[in-house]
Each structure stands twice: as C-alpha cells, then as structure tokens.
Amino acid sequence: MAASKNNFFDHVRWLRQAALDAGFELIIAGESMQALLRRGEYFWVLQPQFLASVNGVAQYTSTLIDEVTHFAGWLPDRSKRWPAANDKLIFKQWAHHAGLRVPAYSISTDSDMTDVVVKRAASSFGAQIQGPFRTCAQCLIDSSRRDYYEQFVDGEIFKVWYWNGAPMAAERDTMPRVTGNGRSSFRRLIEDRANLMQKCEPSELSHLLERAAVVLAYFGRSLDDVPEPGERQIVEFRYGSTLMSPRGRLVLDMRTNVNPRWDELREAGRLLYTAIPEDLRPGTLFTADAIYDGQHFWWLEMNSHPAVHPLAYPAIVASLGATAASRASSASAVRRPVPQTQPNFLN
C-alpha cells in the first residue's frame, strides 16, 4: 500500500525506518511532537508541522493546538522562505525565464483573455481561487490585492516533493467529477460525493456547492440539471478540495520510478532548485504544483515548508547523516553534548 502524507503512522513508519537505515536513534517527544535523531555525539531535532483551521482559514502551525486537523510531517527547518515560493507572480516570471511551461496569465484589469481562473499572488490552500470563467469580464480582479488571471488548464493535478532538487514523491489527482445516473441532479450528486468519506458540515457543503455552480456554469450546466446516465462532469479543480477522493489519487515513488514519462518532473526539479537563494539550498524540501494536460506539465507554483510526504524521509535523514560525517573534523560541525536523560522525550 502506498504511503500517504495524510496518515500519521506512515510518517512514523517511514521516519523510523530511515533512522534505522542511517544508524540513528529516533525519539519522538510526547509533548512537543519534535523528533530527535541522534547518532553518537551528533543530534538533530526535526520540527513538527500541523495543519489547522483557525476561524475557517487553513494554516500550518508548529504547535498541536485545538484547531489542528492533520499532522503535516517533520522538517529539519521550517524557517526557510524565498520569493518564488512566497509569491505566485514572481514564480511565474522566474519559471518562464527558466524555460518551464507556465499557463498564460495577466495582471491587467481589462484583460481580454478567455477561459481563465482568478488567483491571488500570496494565497495558499486554494484560497482566493475563483472560476473558471469564459471571459475576464465575469470576474473583475483587484490589482491592489495582486489578483491575476490565469489560463484554465484541464488535466491531471500533480504535486511533487523535491529534496535538494531531486524528486522524492508525486501525487497525481484527477479533477473531481460526478457521473450521472439519469435521476439525480448535479446538486445531489455533488452532495453525495462530498459526504462519501465523512459527513460534510452544512456550511462547508454550501460553500462546495457555490464553487461547483461556477464550474458547472463554465461548462454550460447548472446545479439543478440532471445529467444523462454515464455522463461525466468536472465539478471542481482546486487541489485539496473536499470533493477530491483518495481513491482517485496515485502516489508515485519518484526515488525509484525511471519511467521516461516523468523526465519532465525530474528536469523541473533541477531548475526549480536554482530558484532558491544559494545559501538556503542545502537541506531544503519543497513542493511544486502542476497540471498535466496529457502531453506536458504546466507549472503553477512552488512551496517552501510544505506538508512532508513520508517518501522524503529516507533522503532527509541520509543527508543529515552525510552532513555529520563530512563535518566530523570541522569546527562548524553539528556537535553538542547530549544529556544523559531527555525528560521531554519519550521512546
């Protein structure tokens, strides 16, 4: 069974095995949820990350607060930031000049682009994404908030994890669709899909239906239409939507997958790594989002301090071990006296 970033025990299993393979002792703190990796007189503390919903807004936090909904993995450093990961417009400009494919976009309030979505340069977790729309006039942008139009690309959704520019894992998701049965309206089909894994809160369901209504309108349909038996219809396109089903996700182990089909992902990682300031590059995990249209990848954004995929732990831990070995005789080595007891850590 493929490892899942949404399964806490997959995180523990993969980190534990990576530690064993590298000759580390692993201790996880019950209070802080930090992970201590220790080998001889060298040790590292991996910082936990959690996904929380605070006042309806999704955000990462390093503390296990009451609003936490998911565990998001352990990172060597949560402080790294760089412009191309903080701002989607900066990313687009950089990626285009680097030779990566990016969807056409415009920051003009009177753009004549067609088939667009509206995004905000500094948003995350799919927030502030609207559309798709046939024309820009259907949704005017606010330049003061750094909104922009982006060409809507229909295809498979990819999120790729890179460690030091090398791909570790990728998730491939299909854009959520419903299938007609000749009796149920799109509204009912969407409600059924939203409640497939667990019952959806009324407020969230209402929000999902509002979004789906816009998507359906783009395709000339409405929530009250009844699709024909077997008719398939896209009802969402945002990554992370409740309408995305884990059953439709394919996890690719990019450490061992040599399929030429994914060469574009490998080359993109090499280029994206150079978008990170040189002094921040060593020991960096980042993700990149793309749409695969059946022939090529169209790159949307990159992210620092992302939710960790368990498949990345072997490379992360191996790098820490290599760092200790290479710095063993250096004054800058990560070398500290290890206390005889660790009162805050539990085996």
Feature names for model-found ranges:
Residues N6, L243-T287, I291-N347:
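C-terminal active-site "lid" helix and adjoining low-complexity regulatory extension at the edge
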Residues Q34-L46, D115-R120, K159-Y162, P167-A169, ...:
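A short beta-strand motif that forms the metal-chelation/ATP-contact edge
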Residues A29, F152-G155, R281-L285:
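Short solvent-exposed loop/turn micro-motifs enriched in small/polar/acidic residues
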Residues F133-T242:
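Phosphate-binding site of ATP-dependent enzymes
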Residues A85, A95, A104-S106, M113-Q130, ...:
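ATP-grasp fold ATP-binding core
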Residues M1-A3, H70-S79, E231-T256:
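A short, surface-exposed helix-loop junction/capping segment
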Residues S4-M113:
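Conserved N-proximal alpha/beta basic substrate-recognition cap immediately N-terminal to
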Residues K88-F91, K119-A121, Q130-G131, E150, ...:
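Active-site ExK catalytic segment of metal-dependent nucleases
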